[in-house]
Amino acid sequence: MTKANFSNSLPLFWGHAQAALHNQIGMAIDVLLGLQWGDEGKGKVVDFLAPNYDIIARFQGGPNAGHTLRIEGKKFVLHTIPSGIFRKELVNLIGNGVVVDPITLVKELDQLSAIGVDYADRLLLARKAHLILPTHRYIDAASEQAKGKEKIGSTLKGIGPTYMDKTGRNGLRVGDLMLPDFHARYEALKEKHLTIAKLYPTIDFDLEAEEQRWMECIETLRSLRQVDCEYYVAEALRRGKRILAEGAQGSMLDIDFGTYPFVTSSNTISAGVCTGLGVAPSAIGEVIGITKAYCTRVGSGPFPTELEDEMGAFLRAEGSEFGATTGRPRRCGWIDLPQLRYTIMLNGVTQLAVTKVDVLNRIREINVATHYHYDGADNDQLPFDLCQTKVTPIYKGYQGWEQSLDDAKVYQDLPVATQSFLGALESALKTPIRMVSIGPEREKLIVKTT
């Protein structure tokens, strides 16, 4: 699908009213984000939709994210750079809401260069994005280790400490790299961190080596094109450019509305686009929510539908469920409708993409959690604190299709049982399913037009 014919297909894909708005003024940012605990397959869907846009923008998170793409049979994992970087016609923007580790970013850039991706004219970096220092990672690791059995499952990438400095008004930003007194500012913040680090037991961390590498990498950041994100996006919208905001992690890891304290340190929901790119709420157009056909979670925290039996192990093996960033095995369970209703509500989701449907190919009966039972009653809402409330999922079983989906090219090619399962999800969630992923490859994504 090319940009030239994209507007003609919009009525099928986004609906008549929104298509008319896009065609008239072009002033909307579409949002794509995960509706579970992350790892929903956002990178693949962004890559699929990318030709319909001019700009792909990350608006929150940092190198704790891991977006996996398979292009021409090869696997690529992006942690900070937007998933549109492989398409030479697109601009990729790292927004002000993202926290940037120069070492991780340069490693990604080196990997792109090694496969012939010329990122120089494709990648923009917001001046107001905050920097992850080596001492942020040191504090993160020391703090997590000190928690013992109470660990929250940090990726140890320095994300939390960096956001703490941001809200505490102590942080360093990308734009600060160009200031003549940057080194003095860096040293002052490092000393604060080292004072904090004394509160924790000593850990194995070669700070001197990490700092040396960090200083080398910031020279690359200085060479990248830096922009005032808010002005850049506003001007792009004024000129009718199409923008897709790419979320990281998942909605259930949102700092305010996720399973606190087992959450990330940023707002992963659609509201984060406004602060993470510097745009007004009225600029938000479509909100595309991504969910797996089952559910996974990495690290600690509540997970109502978790399967700690052979079925859980089967889903993990069949779905290759190991963290793209940490390599940790993911916890697996059945799809959770109360949880999805919650995140659809929070995000204002207008359409759904269901991924990894093929992972269920060999299952005879597929369970779906339709409600919860807690505090002596059935409920379709999440309790205030999933960590402290004993929740029992109430399941409904659906017939599996027990066959490969490889030959399906359009939605109608899917087995009747597959269509029935997806139709039941669509009906229960009261949100249209527009995309169905039946394999890891780029071409294994079906657009549902009716």
Can you describe what each PLM-predicted range is?
Residues 5-8, 22-23:
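Intrinsic-disorder-associated, low-complexity terminal segments enriched in Asp/Asn/His/Tyr and depleted
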Residues 25-450:
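Non-transmembrane, aqueous-exposed alpha-helical and coiled segments at domain scale
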